[in-house]
Each structure stands twice: as structure tokens, then as C-alpha cells.
Amino acid sequence: MAGVWQHPFVNVFKHLRLEEWKKSSKEGDVTSVMDKTLKCTVYRIRGSIPAGNYIQLPKTSSQSLGLTGRYLYILFKPLPGKHFVVHIDVSAEDGQTVRISFSNLFKEFKSTATWLQFPFVCGAIKGSVYDSTAQGARQGMVGPAPSGSRWTCLLLDVQYILSLYLSRRYSHLRSAKLCSNLLVRNLMTSDLLFNPEVNFMEARHAKTLPDGISPMPREMSFPVPKGEKWHDLYDFIMFPSDSSKLPYDSIQKGQSMVTAPGAPMSRSPARERPRSVTISKPVQDRVSLIQQITTPRPMPHRSLLRVESVPERPVSVSARAEEARDLEDRSRGVEQDGGVHVYAHKTNKLSIHRHKSDSEQVICTKVDRPETLSVPPECKKLLPDPIFNLRRIIGFGGCTECFALWTHTGCSVVYPCHAIIVVLEVKTGEQRFLLGHTDKVSALAFNGSCTLLASAQTGSLSMVRLWHFQKGSCLAMFKTHVHSVSYLSFSHSGTVLCGVGKDGHGKTMVVVWNTSQASRSGEVAVLAKAHTDIDIQTMKIAFFDDTRMVSCGKDNVRLWRVRGGTLRSCPVNLGEYHMLEFSDLAFEAGHRPEKEAEDRTLYVSSRSGHILEIDYKNVVLRNVRRVQPGQQQHSERRDKQTFSSGPGIAINSLSVSATFCATGTEDGYLRLWPLDFSGVFLEAEHEGPVSCVAISPEGLRVLSCTSSGELGVLDVPSRGYNTLMRSHTDTLLSFSCHPTHPQLVTVSSDNTIRIWDTGTLQQLYDFTAEEETPCAVTFHPVRQAFACGFSSGTIRFFDITATALQAEHKQHRGAITGLLFSPDGSLMYSCCSLGSVALYSIGHKEQHVLRVLGNVVCKDSERGPMALSLSSDGRLLAFVGPTEYTVTVMDARSLDELLRVDVSILDLDSTTLDCALGLAFSPLKPHHLLVSTSGNKILWLDPKTGRLTREVTQVHKQCCSSLAVSMDTRYMLTAGDRLLKVWDQRQPGTVRPQVFIGHSEAVQQVDFSPDQQSVISAGDAVFIWDFLAAPDPEFTKTDCVPALPFALHSSAALDPSSEHRRDSTFISSGMPRGTAPRPCISSPPRLDISPVQGMDHPDLFSESDDGQEEEGNRDEQERTLVPDTRDNLVESDEQSSVVIIECQPNRAKLLTGSKSNSSSLREGMVKSTHEPPRPDSYTHFHTRFKASCLAKGMCHPPEGQEMLTLRALIGYNGNGRANMAWNPDTGFFSYTCGCVIVVEDLHSGSQRHWLGHPEEISTLALTNDALVLASASGSGDGSSLCQIRIWDTQDGSCMKILTHHRTEVQAMSYSRDDRLFVSIGDYRDGNLALWSTKGYELLATSRLFQPVHAVTFNPAHFDDFASAGPGAVSFWRIETQGTDTQIKVYRVAVPEEVGTAAELTSITYNSTSLLYSGCSTGQVCVWDCQTHRCFLTWEADQGEIGILLCRGNRLLTGSNTRRIRLWCVAAVQELREKGSGASSTSVLMEHEMTLDGAIVSATFDDALEMGIVGTTAGTLWYINWVENTSIRLISGHRNKVMDLAVAHGESHCATCGEDGSLRIWSLQSCELLLQFQVLNQSCLCLAWSPQPKSGPSTEDQRIAAGYSDGTIRIFSVSKTEMEMKIHPHPCAVTSIAYSTSGDVLLTGGKDGQMAITSPRTGMTIRVLSDHKGSPITTIECTGRKLTGLPTDGELWLAASTDRRVSIWASDWSKDKCELLDWLSFPAPTSQKDLDVSVPTLAAFCPWQPGTVVYSGFGVEKEILFYSLIQKQVLLRIPLSHFATSLTLSPAASLIAVGSNERLLRLIDTSAGTKQDFAAYDDGVHLCRVSPSGNLLLTASYNQVLVWDIQNS
């Protein structure tokens, strides 16, 4: 009955009256606050150390709560960005106490007999970024609680936990300890299972809950506002979960307690198998589609599809790194709680935010495609882990130089180096480290066997750590109760530890701990402690008695003893020496059996030089001696030291062995004395006072330490001295590594400059400045010399080999804050704290000052090594200034200002101004400038434009003091306060940085070693880390060595070869994409697609119809040029016969013909229907007008030596008809784009390309077994034959080429048994051909009365097929007699109800020989094939029906209204049989979808449930009627592609088209990622802003595009919106480019005028009219500065159609723009030869600086290389055709040339070879090589081809 009072529940906080803190305790930062969400008071526990900030229930651990409830409810909320720990102590029935802990600090589940540790998964706000990225993340989402953490009701089934994990029976709850960082509302125990979603009040009005579940008590429930759902606001976690699918090794959110009947169970993210591909919702739908449509399956069935789970959309999120104190928590938590491991919980919704179009109809649309399929959404671990390994430390001491210990073997010494304990092997010099302290180590002590090491940490977090010395593991860590421990002493047995320090009031405090259990349980208990007013310098435990201690200090020597839990002491009567200041003590070593253990001498040393000998047993002073300095007899000889009563020398340390005594004194001497102190028998002089001496265990060596930072060993027998370590004695300020020698130079506040050997850690040289502090230092990159800047403003140049000062510069008045050499060492740069910067010329013998600028650098002396930064190519110099808010970039050769960036305005959301603290250039081009700011950010700026390309936020809690980037730019190092962080810059935001501790002071500088194999950090000491992700050493030797500029004299000359890798076409070197913009559900809005009407229907034209009408007119003109081939037709038709039967409404006429007269009949048809009118139907194929023509010959590349391979093709030809094929059983999927057949693997997205057609492919036909594909292309202008190619789908080989039709092929079809194949020509051809698939022999032909739009075989009768055309349907019958084949046709006119003007545009059979036909009026007619009559019509659409598919009782219609509809036609069969007596006379529309264009192709499965549909917009859609979803599979441009550009990084490209669309594509998957649509305008040119981007983060990138109305629009890619609209031109903008700095936009118009516009303000700076009257075709910029030109500005060129090229030099920062050169190229004298379609092309040559490459219309077809310096043509490359596009590779001497003859030519200028590639059906009007030279992108009308450049 004792537990009756606990029923039904116990409110623990109320039970203990927590607010009174009488029955409970709190420690640290625990406060009560009002929570707005819960609307009540809660307790907030926060602090850096969980063990020091907590609520303890009950007050002491010896008490017990005694709560017997099975379930423990904890209502809490983790604090965002922090870790928390909760400990629950429970008792089992056998009396055993078990601790159950859960924390988001734990990495994995751990279990012992008395402790269970569970990782905890923090929930986030529903729909937040963390919530969406946490799906399935088990290994990656390690870290603190997310920013959107929620209130959580955690239900622990304590009884089940003990039973499940430890097989124990639960008794009661003893205690609970809630540790920082969290908010807690209450705790509750009960035997009842409560549902937190429902409280008692709600339960009264609601339905009954399931059995065994009760409503949550009101005082424990969470409030839910009206209209909200509980689970949208809070998390409920039951552990262990009742779901078998949730893991038992972590505490995480599962499903709701009350589950609807039949609802599927949610899957555990922790138990899901790792996915090889993590993709967004639309593409997961596509993958689901692929799985369905590529998997062979049985016959169709009508069961509904069920979706088990809906995939989530991944959103990249930047990981928040752990900061200094968080890491301190972790360092403690490693011993207590394990590591960090987070499981992410699932949710099932993600908010999609769409951007609205603005007032001028700019539609910014995201396409439902992810960027890639390989980037996981969770935040991944940076690998390798750890990426650093601490290898060497240069340093000693820190807090103290009084502790250095021998190990028991004498092989190693142990000493502190600030916060690190170093174990140094004496012989080899190898180091190992004991890591864990976060502040300076103030004391060390070994036990007698050296198995245990005790170390004390000073500072506000004073603590003691006990170490297992051999393993290097920390056994225990505990508070010292004193502010700082100054001395530690271990007993010989290791069971007692004594510590001395000062308390908070400055009083001396002695604490004695019991460490006997430390090795087993990690518990350390305080035996005794005492406060005293006496001074204690040294205190040691007697090695013969663990309870006795001796101390000495100022005016005292005392004996101590621990007894009965108290610590008592008594002084030693020193008589007249009681006023001395005692410094150290030592017991007599050894033991004689005849004596008692305590009968020995105690030696005590003093600051006055005295050594006292005390009888320890009798506490009597025996003898006093004093060491005094000897007289200087000679300058090089010193008399032996003796003891006398004269003035003494301070003794700092004392060590006694069995045979001698060692003393370390203030005069810098280590002296060895015999035990009778008769005289010194050996001494060693040091540079500073000796602070510590220690005799080795064998007594043959003496370890000595000095206060000047020297650690050494004196070998007594050999009298040799070995310096083990030297160290700076104050903070290091800067360091520099020599590029070729293993040397490191450091400067420190101790006024010394030291040079170290990084291999041996030995100090090589030491330079001392007495009255000034060295502030900055840098090695000369070539010579054995270095420069050092001092606090006085002086810069000194030292020659190391001569150890001499070579030069001294005094141009500065303030302390030197920055000092750098140029990469070749010919220039030196310096800046000072008073704002001046200087440039020096450094020669081998002389050094000169070239330029000094004042008040340009921020006046701040705290910037240190990051004050100046130089790009690796030596061209750009950057610094913070002239104010702390600005960063200035200068020309490093002349100190001319190039750019000034205000970093304070880059963060628009910040309420404070951001200051720049330091900067660094990235090593590789484009040499991003990294700026650290006071807002704890790293800004990646484009050094040419100043644009922010990337931003890393929350880098450190305090300001970043140093940063560096690896040579391959993948890794970034940052230092802040005492931490080092490593960031992966290839995947920013997706990989957590690694954090490294060890420094006890702020890290002043961090950098990679020159060979990239190590990382060096300096602050309190020099840390050398092994970089485990170091690149291949060959990379640093070849790729990363910068090109060195020429020596600077009077003017800065430009190196013409240093930028040989830059792309000549600036448009091609746009920004890279870290992550693609998130796609939205809706597809881009498209304009209506209506058929090309006659001139009498102007109202049906859309904005794009003008072009179609023009094309139609051109087609009419072209039609008159087609030769009459009737004679050939007659000859070919003699081999077959045809019987034509025409049926009219009122009469029937039978025409029969034999084989002899069929030719005359056909000839009459040809004559009567010569030049038929063009059908007014969108279904009929009309080849696009092409002004290009096929080349007569080409240079085929040798087999196997092709320089180009076709990687991918972007686009689908929406102009084709039925030009897509898919087999649902085999998964074969193909479509056409131009003259190429693309076969795509729907699993991987990989493409195969079947080439061979010379013209645009009009249609495809796939056999029923999907083994053979037929494709047809036309004859174009008559120069090529119309081809039907037969392909083997297995290997892609062309088996046969059929030539029969003279123009285009409109439709093709295979019979049901694949024995027959029929092809029908277009309206100009008018022929039907029947083929046998066995050898593809022509069986029969027929001349058609009228154009035919569609043909299809009857699936029920292999010899029947039907065709449809204007006003009639034709039923064809094939009759075979022997080898003769005859075709009979019965032609039936459309019913009068449909109208005589209607055309039948599409047909399809069902399985019972019913024929459905679609009409141009939108009606569907149903025909009985046996009686040839139409018995049913209905209006299925408002437009022309171009697609019909029938499967069973379902019919699909697709029309030019962009709609597809699914009909139930079950009543049609009954109407056919019963007529008006049928029970149902109606058809029902089941579904409807509207797509982005008129429907031109469709293929569905046998149940018409899912399929693929193509539209005139160039899109292929996946349609699923069951789920009523449509997903884009393939996208493309509908109209001509006007321009394209490749983004930096080559993961994306951008294209723009005549339809006003600007599209961004993934080059890996060829998927459309983003589309900007401007209505009623054409987008004619585009350019990426010049800031590159390498990863997914929140920074922006922009694209500028020029339009036909003269406007320029600048679009933000990440924001998916238009940022600015500029109108600098009165007519169309034909060319656009960013300047290399990004400060201005250069645009050219159709009128020949060029505008210089600021993309920031939108203002037009100037207008250039030099090309007025001729449209601008090309504008290109280059940042290369050329030697020999009379200017040093940025170069750019412009070309116009009048064959003129202007070369300009501009300095936009100075508003300079000068015409440098003017090139005019001659044209043929005859006007009739003038070809306006040939553009003028010009570009800068990347591999020949100062050379312009030109091609255009002229006397000869050629490419010219013109030298701007020599003013002459250097090279002429002849061409076979005029070039319509031109691009040059930045990586090799390759030129790609496109021509109007549909050829792409690749010319290797170095080898003199050329290769032609034909994969186009129109002229190649665009060519772009990617920035790296690996990819070539070309465009031909609306198709974009991506080529791989081989051996580039």
C-alpha cells in the first residue's frame, strides 16, 4: 500500500516543491523563465559544462525519490545549437543502481552492467530545413540540437528498459539529474500510459481512447491553439517504441501513439538501408516511374497502385560547427557519455515557397528536377576523420617551467606545453601527447611506478586529470575546488594525490584526494582539505607514507598528515632561518635496512641560496649551507662554487639521488654536488635561470628546465649536454615556412626571432631585438633569407646563411602588421598600423623602395599575419582599408587600386556593421578573396567584381584570427580563440567542419605547409599537424606553382603567359553552382501552341506564330523548287497493284484496277493533285525551314582517334510527330532531337546516340517486341534522300536504310505480328509503302488521293490497317497471292454531323476491331470496321485531336489545346451491338491534365495507367493516371537557342531562346533546373556574373540577359527572381558580357551602339557609337595584361557585322575606356557574293597572349590570328566553309568552328590537324568551350549538344 499515494501519477516537481530548492538542488546557470509556447514557467538549464549546470532530484545522491511508477514522463526542450545530458538513476529489485542516460552528445548506444547510454535525436519544427534534411540521416547529422527544436514529451518505460537491456526487474526511481542545455517543464511518474495529444478536458467531449491509454493530466499537458494539431507543434517519443520498426539503440521520434486503423506504420530512418541515390520528390517519382516502366511485368491488370511512402525533397543545409565550449563539453563527455551521434526523425511534409511573378510578367519558375542524384541531403562527416593528427609541438612550459618528469625507465621525459602534455623520447626525439586540457597545465606528478600521471589545469575551469600513462587515456577528471593548482604530488602507491593552490579569496588551500578507485570506476574522492594563510611553494607526499606530506614556502617548512578525514600540519623550527623564502624540497633517496623508513634527511632549498638539511623523523634542523657566486678571475674561467656565509644565489629547484644532489639556480647554472656539498663536480650553464632539475631513475642523467624555455639533459658520465626543446617564452605573433627548405621562422612577443628545423624541431638560429618587438615575418621564396617587421616600423632583411643583416627599411612609423614577398621574390610588400603600405624591389645586392602609400590600410595593429594578402600568381594585393569596413584590392605590380568592397553592407539583415578583420586569397584561379569579419563570417569575394560568391557563417564564437586555403582550394582552415576548424569547400553546407583543440591561447596564425602535407598553427606554441587529406605531392609541384610575374621597374608590365589557362570567351566562364535551386511542383508556364493558320485566321496566332508563319511561307517557296519525280514513281509502282473503293454518303462508286492500268491511274492522280495545298492541321508534320545546307564533304576523324565524343543531348524535338518510343515491358525508351535518336536509360539517365540521319527526324515506330526501331528523316532541300533507318535496339546498329519517299515521312506502323511495316509520306510525297520486315523488301506502294495524317494496324487482324486524312478514313486490306501482294482500300467520308470541313487527324483501334478517329474539330468518331460505318461521335475536346490511344475500355485523347483526357468507353461496345437499346449511351471522362504544349506523341502501358507524352514545347512528360501526377522527363527549347554559357565548375550551363526563356541545366543529368520566362520578348544573349561558386550555401549568383526590346534583365539564380531591369538600348541587345572585375556590363545592340552599364546601380556609364549602323555580334573581355601595349587596363573587344573589330582598354575604377586598336577586314567586291548570314567572330587567343582570332565573311574562308603588339596577321587557317560560330579552348591549342553546312570542325593548331563531326540538322550557330577545356557545348537551332574533348 506504500505506493497507493502515487496513483494515478506523481508530479515530481510539485512533489519536491522544486521552487523552494529544499528537497532538490541546482548548480550553475539554472533559472526559471516564462515560455511563450507553453504559457507557463519552465526551468532553463544552460552552461558550457553539463556536469556544472544541472538540477538534481532529490538534493543529494544518498537520498532516493522512491517513485515506483513504471513510466517516466519528461517534458523538456533542448536548447538550439547545444548539447544536453539527462541521467536517470533507478534501482532494481536486487538492490543494484542503474544509471540510464540519454543525450544528443552520444555517438552510439553503450551498455555496461550499471550504465545505459542512449543517443537522443532532437526533433525540429515541421517543414524546417533541419526537419527536411534529417530524413534517414543516421551517420551524418551529428551535432547539437537544431535551431527549430521543439518541446518534447519523452515517455520512458523504465521497467521495460531494465528488462530488455539488463535482464533486471525494476523497483523504483532513485534520482534524476537534468544537465545543461535544455528547458524543462516537469517530470511525472505513473503506471498509466497517457496520450499527450488529449488532456482530461478534451477527453470529456471526445470519443473514448483505445484500451490502456489515458488522457494526459491537465497540469502536464501542452497547450494546442485552435486549428492546430498537437504533432505539428510538439514531439512525442515513447522509448522503447512499441513499433518493431523503430531502433532500440537510440531515442528518437516515431509515430503517433494513436494510429488510425489501417494506416501504414512509419518507417524508422535509422533502420532504413542506405540509399545509393538521395533525390527530391519529383525525381523520386521519376525513379518510381522508371522502376515501373523498365521492369518486365505480366499482363495488365486493373488493380490500383499503392504508394507506400512519399519521398522527401532534399534541401542542403550548412552544418553549425561546435564551438570552443561545446568542444570542452565533448572532451568531458568522451569519458562520461561517449561521443556525438544523432539520428534524424522523419516527417512527411515540406513547405514549398513559390515566387510570384512581378508586374512586368517575368515568370521565375523552378523545374521539378534536383541538381544531382548523388548528393545526400544529410549533413555528412568530413573524411578522413580526424583529418589532422598532431605530430610535433615546438614549445615548452606556458603556465610554468617548473615541471618536467622522468619516466620510470628513463627513456622519456614528460613536460607541459601550455594545454598539452608532451611525452618526448630522449633518443629519437619522437613525441606523443596527452590531449584533453583546455587551458594551461600548471602541475604534473607521477606515482612511484609511473603508471598514473596527474595533471592540473589552471584558469577559471581549474581541474585535475588522472591519466593512464601508457595508454594515454584519461581515467578521471574532477574539480579542484581551488582557482589554480600550483603544485601536485602523487603518493608512491598512486592512491593519494595532494594538490596546492589558491581559493577564490587568495588563501592557500591544500586538497588531498583518494585516487585508489580511479583506474576502475573513475571515481576520485576528497580525503581532506584545508585552508591556510601560509605560503606553499612545494608540497610532496612522502614516498614511504601516503598519509604524510611536507611543504615549504615563504617563511615556513611544514609537515602534514591526513588522519580521520582531517588534514593537520606542524611547522619545523628553523630558528634564525625562519624568514627565508623556501623554493623546493627533496627527500633523501634510497633506504637502508637498519633505519626506519621515516628516518631520513629532508633537503630544502631557498631563494637566498641556502640548503637546509632537516632530520625528518625528529623534526630537527641538522645543517645549513649556502651557495654563492665565485669570483671572476678570468673572463673565460670561473672558480669552483663553495658554501659560505657570503651572499647567495637563488636556488629554484633541487633534486637528490643516492649519490649526488642537483641544483638549479637563478644564475642559469645546473650544478651537481656530492651529498656532503663539498664542492661542485659538474655544472652546465644555461641561457636563463634554471627553474627545474630532475635526476633520472638510474642516476646518470639530469633533466633541466629554464625559465627561458629550454629543456635539456646533462649526461653525467660523458659530461655531454643535449638540448631537447627550446621555446618562445611569450605569445607567438607570426611564422613563415620556407618553400623549399624544411625551415620555419617564428617571431614572438619575447622579442626574439627564431628559425627551426621542422624535421628535428631543433632551433637553428636566434635573433634578439632588445627594445622592439618583431611583429611580422616572411621567408624569401627563393633565397635563404627572410624579412621581419618590428613594432618600431622598421623592416629588416636577414641573410640566413651569412647570419647577417642585409638591408633595413624605415618607411613606416607604426608597427608592421603585414609583410609579404611576391612569388618570385622580386617584390616585397609591407603595411603598418598607421595605415601606410609600401612596395619594394628586392634584388640580390640592392633593395629599393618603389612606392609608398599613406592612409590606405586600416589603422589597427591587431591584424597580424592577415593584414596583407597576395594572390598566388602575384598579381593582386589585398588588405583591409582604408576603414575597417572596406577591403581594397590593388594591382600588386604598381599598387594601383583595382577594387574596393564595403563588407558592412553585404549582410542586409544584420543590425550591426560588419568589420573586416583579415583576409587571404585562395591559391587557384579565380583567386577568391576570403575575408573574415567581426560577425564571425568568412566572405568569399570575387577579386575582380567584388561580388559575394559564398558566405560561411558562425565560423567561430569569437572572431576568426587566421584563415588559410589548401592549394587545391578544397579545404579551408580557420582559427578562432583556441580552436582550429577544417572546412570542406567542395561541398559547402553539406559537410560538417572538424574542430581541433589543444591551444590554450588564441591561435595567431594557421597555414598549410608548402608541400601541403602538414598544417602549422601558432599561438602559445607551434603545433605541426599531419594533414591526412593531403593531396598528391605531384599536384603541388605542377598545378599549383603560380606563374611568376616579371620584375617590376618603372611601370608594371604584364606577363602575357601567366594566364594561359584562361578561357578566351568570358561568357563561358560563369559561376559554378554548389547546389541547384530547389525545384517546385509546378512546371514553367508556357504559351498556347496553336496550329499555323492561314492568313484569314489572324486571331489564332500566338506570340510565336509569327515565326511559324514565316517558316510556312518559306516552305511554300521551297515547294516550287522540288523537281517532278513522277516518272520514277511510275516505275517503282509497277511492281504492285491497288484497288481503291470510295464511299460517299449518298452513293458508292467502285473502282477496280489491274496491274497493267494501275500506273496510268496513279499518273492521273499525280497530275490532278500536283502541288497539293499544305494541310491545315498541326498533326501533319511540317519540317522546319532551314537556310543551311549539307556539306559536300568532310574530314572524318580516324577511328579511335576522335577528339570529340558526344556525351549528352539536351532537348526533345517537339516539331516531330510520334517521335518518341517506349516499351513498358522491356523499358526501352527513345526519342529524337534534330537528326539524332537519343536512347536513354531511365534508371541511370545515361544516353546513347544513334547518328546517321542527315535531316530532321519526323517520326519513329517500334516493333511490338521492342527489338527493332524504325526512324524516318526527310530530304530537306532535295540534296539528300528521304531515309527510313531500321535499328537494332539491342546494340544500336543500323540494319537497313530504306529509300522510297521523296520528301518527308508522316507516319509509320508495324503490324501486330511485326511481319509488315507501312510508311506514309507527307502531303508533298503522297505515297504509301508496304514493306516486309523480312529483309525489308518493298511489297506494295500506293499513291494517295489526299494527305494522310495517321496510319495504324488493326491488332485483331494482321492484314488490316487504317489511315486518316482530310474528310475521310481509309480501311486497307492486304491480300497476298504467292509472291504478289495487293492492297484494297475502302474510303469512307466523315459523317455529316462532324462537318464536311473536318479532317480526321488521329486514329486508334481497340481489341475488338473498333476504330476511334479524332477530328480537327475536337470530336471523336467510332467506326465499325466490319460495316465501315460510323455509329457514334462525341465532342472530346475544343481543339484538334492529334493523339488517340485505346486500351480495353479506356481511351486517351490529346489535342492542341494542351490537354490530355482519359475516357471510359465501356458503353461503346454495347452501342455497337444494341444501338439505341443499349443500357448506357454515354462515355465518361475520368481524368484530365493540361500540359505545356500541343500533344504530338504518346505511349502508354496496356492499362492506360501510366505513360509518356511529348508536346510541341519540347517536353516529355511522365503521366500517372492512378496518382493523377505529371512529371517532366525531358525538357528542351521550343525555339532557337540564341546563346549559351557554361558555369564555372562545369556542373551547369545556361541557355536562352527566342521564346524569351532563360534556362539553367545540369550538365550531369541534362535536366532543367530553373527557368526564367519573359513574355512577348526574345532573349538574345546572356552572361554569368563572374563570381564562381563551389558549393551549396546561401550566397547568390546572377545571370544577365539581353532582350529584343533593348532591355537587360539581371536574374538572381538562388532567389529565382529578377533583381534588376535596365534599358540602355533603343533596339535589341545582341551581345552581352561582364567585365572581368564584374563592375560593369558591356552590351551591344542591333544598331551597333555599345553601352557600359553598372549592374549594381543600373545606370548607363557611357555609350560607344564606333560600330553604329552594324549589329554587334561579339563582346569579349580578358583580364590579361599584355607587355608591349601602351596601357595597363582591362582589355575587351567588340565585333560587328560589317567585319570590324575594335579593341579597348578600360580601367573601370578610374572611369577610363580607350580605343586601343581597330581592325577592318575586306569583303568580296561583288555585292552578289555578300552573305549576310555569316557573322563576324572574334576572340582573344588563350595560348597566344596579345593575339586576336578573327573569322568572318571575306574573300577567303579562313581564320586569322592577328597580333595586337606586332600589328600584323601571324597565322591563317583555311576553312572549307564560312564559320558561323567560333570558340577557343583555354586548356589546349584547339579551335572549334561551326558552319552553316551543319558541320562542327575541331582544329588542333599545334598539330595542324582537323576533324569534322556531323550530328546536326541545321547550321551550328553556337560553340562554347567550358572554362577547363574539358567540354564543348554547341547549339543548332533548338538542340544543345554536349561533347567531351578527348586529351584536352
Curated annotation (Swiss-Prot):
> Which intervals carry biased composition (Acidic residues)?
1102-1113
Region Binds with microtubules: start-end pairs: 1-222
- GO terms, biological process: centriole elongation; cilium assembly
Record keywords: Cytoplasm included? yes
Q: Show the GO cellular component annotation of the record.
A: centriolar satellite; centriole; cytoplasm; microtubule
Q: Where in the cell is it found?
A: Cytoplasm, Cytoskeleton, Microtubule organizing center, Centrosome, Centriole; Cytoplasm, Cytoskeleton, Microtubule organizing center, Centrosome, Centriolar satellite
Main site of residence? cytoplasm
Q: Does the keyword Repeat apply?
A: yes
Residue ranges of the WD repeats are 436-479, 481-523, 530-570, 644-683, 685-724, 727-766, 769-808, 811-850, 955-993, 998-1035, 1252-1297, 1300-1341, 1343-1382, 1395-1433, 1435-1473, 1532-1571, 1574-1621, 1624-1663, 1670-1714, 1774-1813, 1815-1848
Name of the protein described by the UniProt record: WD repeat-containing protein 90
UniProt source species: Xenopus tropicalis
